[in-house]
Amino acid sequence: MPLHKSAEKRLRQSERRNARNRARKKELKTLIKNMQKLIEARAAKSEVESAYRSAVQKLDRLGVKSYIHANKASRKKSQLTRLFNGYAEAE
C-alpha cells in the first residue's frame, strides 16, 4: 500500500490506465477474431472487407498511440492483409 498521498493518486491513475489499455487490446483481438470467423464461415467478400478495414484501422490507431508496439501493429496488419488477399483470390 502506498504511504504517501501522491503515491495513492499514482496507484489510482495506474489502475484506470491499465483497465483502459486492456479494454483497447481486447477490442482489437475481438476485431481480428471476427474477421477470421467470417473467413472461416465463407462470408460475403464485402463483410470480410469491412471487418478487415476496421481491424486495420484499430491496429493503426493503437500502434501510433503506443498501446502496442508499432512493429507489432505493422506485423499484424501484414498478416491480416495476406489473409484477406488469400480469401479475396479464392472468391
Swiss-Prot record:
Residues 1-18 have a biased composition (Basic and acidic residues). It comes from the Bacteria. The keyword S-adenosyl-L-methionine does not apply. One of its GO terms (cellular component) is small ribosomal subunit. The keyword rRNA-binding applies. Residues 1-25 are annotated as: Disordered. Gene3D superfamilies: Ribosomal protein S20. This is Small ribosomal subunit protein bS20. The gene is rpsT.
